[in-house]
């Protein structure tokens, strides 16, 4: 998937992130301000792996292993806080971490940002559980979870916020100590904003400075239930579903529904409703002219349905088999989960074997450096693609071929102005608020060209 190239380019572009929001050594050397518009903090370990090992492909894979391990730890910790039962916590950790949709994000879509955001959803679930139901003084867990998602994937932040708002509306009537719990939710919101300000403020500042090319919304449409059931039963990871293992857990939860408390039932039916919303039975057409269109793909909801169903499934499995030899039974379910996980991944690889692209370690850095990504450029650049794609430089109205040198923090352009007068140099370099340029060591002002790129006057 081209998202692999995108994230590899992001990784190598973090080598100067503490000194500059722009790196000229990635995204085809056009000076994309990616680190302002796409959160990077939780990606930074991947860059550290790369610096230690010097192998971009290996570092990328180790980072996914690290995130998978972290997902297991966060899931176990979150469920342990909710249920105070290590067996339920272990079951939830395994079921959620090796859920089909998370595997699809990693292996089929290469959607690293969303996959990492899934790591922190259990923490947000636990934070909401404390505020809504139990010890509202532990509201800080919600802030920690939300902040980590903010520094990972902005669309996931929007989706989580909608879920928090929806569950607040549905559950508020049943709360005790309503004022105290609302204040705790407000505290969590305020703290999240302050903790996230390092990303949010520059993001808002640059977004307001000019009209940008951003990922477009798409016509929203769910999957036909018959198709969804077929893909689930086939454990097909080429299509975006919750997978066979969670589906079996969903059926089991309906059969043993009396094992669930009122709180568990709320989470379970929330998962069922979200799964229903991912089908074409839900009237998504009504939202195609609203901000909801930014969701782009309805199947993104599977991350949330996987969370809620995995929560319920772990409880049901435990209470069905809560006799002796719990460790042995957990091992059996772990084995089953891993078998279905591996079969789904291997089937997906086999089905796509003719279209797979293998990135050799020795080629990875060059591929990442030269990958051209046009999101977050000035919107006007959409109408002049040749300027970017062909690296065109114009001195006045004449195309020239200057010598260029790229460093992480700096792009140097060498040319002679033979016009003997001030002439405008138009470059294929993106322009953002705060850009610094100099000619022969003297600071000069830059402007936004009619092509949506940087221009400056050469004496």
Segments (PLM) and residue ranges:
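Active-site lumenal/periplasmic loops and adjacent helix-entry segments of GT-C-fold
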Residues: 1-82, 86-122, 127, 155
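Membrane-interface alpha helices of multi-pass inner-membrane proteins
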Residues: 127, 139-154, 188-194
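Periplasmic/ER-lumenal interhelical loops and adjacent helix-loop junctions
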Residues: 182-185, 189-255, 369-372
């Amino acid at each position: 998937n081209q998202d692999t190239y995108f994230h590899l380019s992001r990784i190598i572009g973090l080598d100067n992130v503490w000194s500059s929001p722009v790196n000229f050594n990635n995204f085809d050397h056009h000076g994309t301000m990616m680190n302002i518009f796409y959160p990077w903090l939780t990606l930074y370990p991947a860059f550290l792996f790369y610096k230690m090992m010097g192998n971009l492909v290996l570092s990328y894979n180790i980072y996914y292993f690290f995130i998978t391990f972290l997902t297991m730890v966060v899931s176990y910790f979150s469920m342990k806080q909710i249920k105070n039962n290590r067996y339920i916590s272990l079951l939830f950790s395994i079921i959620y971490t090796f859920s089909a949709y998370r595997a699809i994000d990693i292996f089929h879509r290469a959607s690293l940002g969303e996959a990492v955001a899934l790591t922190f959803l259990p923490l947000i679930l636990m934070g909401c559980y404390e505020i809504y139901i139990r010890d509202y003084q532990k509201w800080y867990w919600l802030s920690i979870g939300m902040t980590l998602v903010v520094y990972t994937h902005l669309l996931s932040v929007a989706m989580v916020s909608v879920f928090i708002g929806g569950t607040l509306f549905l559950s508020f009537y049943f709360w005790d100590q309503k004022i105290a719990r609302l204040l705790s939710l407000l505290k969590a919101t305020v703290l999240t904003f302050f903790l996230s300000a390092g990303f949010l403020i520059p993001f808002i500042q640059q977004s307001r400075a000019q009209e940008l090319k951003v990922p477009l919304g798409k016509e929203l449409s769910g999957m036909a239930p018959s198709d969804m059931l077929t893909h689930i039963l086939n454990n097909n990871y080429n299509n975006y579903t919750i997978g066979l293992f969670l589906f079996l857990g969903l059926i089991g939860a309906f059969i043993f529904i009396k094992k669930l408390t009122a709180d568990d039932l709320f989470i379970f039916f929330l998962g069922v409703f979200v799964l229903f919303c991912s089908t074409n039975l839900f009237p998504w057409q009504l939202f195609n002219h609203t901000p909801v269109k930014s969701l782009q793909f309805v199947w993104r909801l599977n991350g949330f349905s996987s969370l809620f169903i995995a929560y319920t499934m772990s409880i049901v499995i435990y209470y069905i088999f809560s006799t002796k030899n719990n460790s042995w039974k957990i091992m059996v379910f772990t084995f089953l989960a891993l078998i279905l996980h591996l079969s789904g991944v291997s089937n997906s690889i086999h089905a796509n074997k003719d279209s797979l692209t293998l990135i050799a370690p020795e080629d990875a850095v060059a591929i990442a450096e030269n990958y051209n990504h046009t999101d977050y450029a000035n919107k006007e650049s959409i109408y002049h693609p040749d300027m970017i794609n062909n690296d065109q430089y114009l001195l006045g109205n004449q195309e020239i071929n200057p010598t260029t040198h790229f460093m992480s923090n700096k792009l140097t352009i060498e040319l002679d102005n033979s016009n003997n007068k001030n002439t405008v140099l138009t470059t294929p370099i993106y322009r953002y608020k705060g850009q610094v340029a100099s000619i022969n060591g003297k600071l000069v002002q830059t402007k936004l060209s009619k092509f949506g790129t940087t221009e400056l006057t050469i004496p």
